[in-house]
């Protein structure tokens, strides 16, 4: 078995609670600016999260929930692009100094940097949104902490397809067995598994009841020394928080 050489993180819901606290409010603010009377409730947004990608989510919503909506110039593609650009503007404003990292994320990232374990991101989120979050929640140079940021439309098909993970692996010049993925959702788990990656799940309010069959671990968070995680599935031995030692143990398991 090869050594653990890289951690590949999802972003939304994994690094931070951005789905609940930034993306959904940003969509609703974009709808207001566009003069639309749409509002995505917490419950509805949970359903829409089954669709990977913001633009794809808007398109699905229009087709499934607003089928009688008069699309400007009958150009759905351009309507979706424009609305998503407005949403991204609001997202960037919302994350500045407002969205903290989830427990254990900064500690694990810093430990990986110290020990020479490479860091990458694999997400359906727009690259500008990822950059805004990393700069605000990690450090002004946060994006540079990650050797590869595979995001948004860099790949043709989004999660649950494996394309974004395959892109990250190729950019790292690593094999799946060299890496561990950290995700928060069923869709993300399917993508990572299809790319051949062992995966750790940290659930959130939107995803805690999803099917995580095949994950190495399912946790409520990565935890901290003074804020132990809750193990929902898997074997952590005596560990009370997720660190590189535990990551390496999982990586070595057959």
Please report, for each region that a protein language model flagged, where it lies by residue.
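A structural preference for short, pocket-lining loop segments at secondary-structure junctions
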Residues: 117-119
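N-terminal helical cap/lid subdomain that shapes the substrate entry/recognition surface
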Residues: 2-11, 15-103, 110, 114-115
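Asp-based, Mg2+/Mn2+-dependent phosphohydrolase catalytic module
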Residues: 2-3, 110, 126-254
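Conserved phosphate-coupling serine/threonine residues in phosphotransfer and NTP-handling enzymes
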Residues: 14, 123-125
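Non-catalytic, surface-exposed connector residues within folded enzymatic/regulatory domains
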Residues: 21, 39, 74, 99, ...
């Amino acid at each position: 078995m090869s050594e653990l050489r890289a951690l590949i993180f999802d972003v939304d819901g994994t690094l931070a609670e951005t789905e609940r606290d930034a993306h959904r409010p940003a969509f609703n603010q974009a709808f207001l600016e566009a003069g639309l009377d749409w509002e995505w409730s917490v419950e509805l947004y949970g359903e829409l999260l089954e669709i990977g990608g913001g633009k794809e989510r808007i398109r699905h919503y229009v087709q499934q929930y607003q089928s009688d909506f008069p699309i400007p110039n009958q150009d759905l593609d351009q309507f979706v692009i424009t609305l998503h650009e407005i949403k991204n503007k609001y997202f960037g404003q919302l994350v500045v100094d407002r969205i903290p990292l989830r427990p254990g994320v900064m500690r694990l990232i810093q430990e990986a940097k110290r020990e020479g374990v490479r860091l990458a991101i694999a997400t359906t989120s727009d690259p500008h949104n990822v950059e805004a979050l990393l700069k605000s929640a990690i450090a002004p140079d946060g994006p540079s902490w990650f050797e590869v940021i595979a995001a948004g439309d860099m790949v043709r098909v989004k999660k649950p397809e494996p394309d974004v993970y395959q892109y990250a692996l190729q950019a790292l010049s690593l094999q799946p067995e060299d890496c561990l993925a950290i995700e928060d959702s069923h869709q993300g788990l399917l993508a990572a598994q299809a790319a051949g990656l062992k995966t750790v799940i940290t659930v959130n309010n939107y995803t805690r009841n999803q099917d995580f069959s095949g994950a190495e671990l399912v946790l409520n968070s990565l935890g901290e020394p003074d804020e132990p995680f809750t193990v929902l599935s898997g074997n952590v031995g005596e560990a009370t928080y997720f660190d590189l030692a535990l990551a390496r143990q999982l990586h070595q398991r057959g």
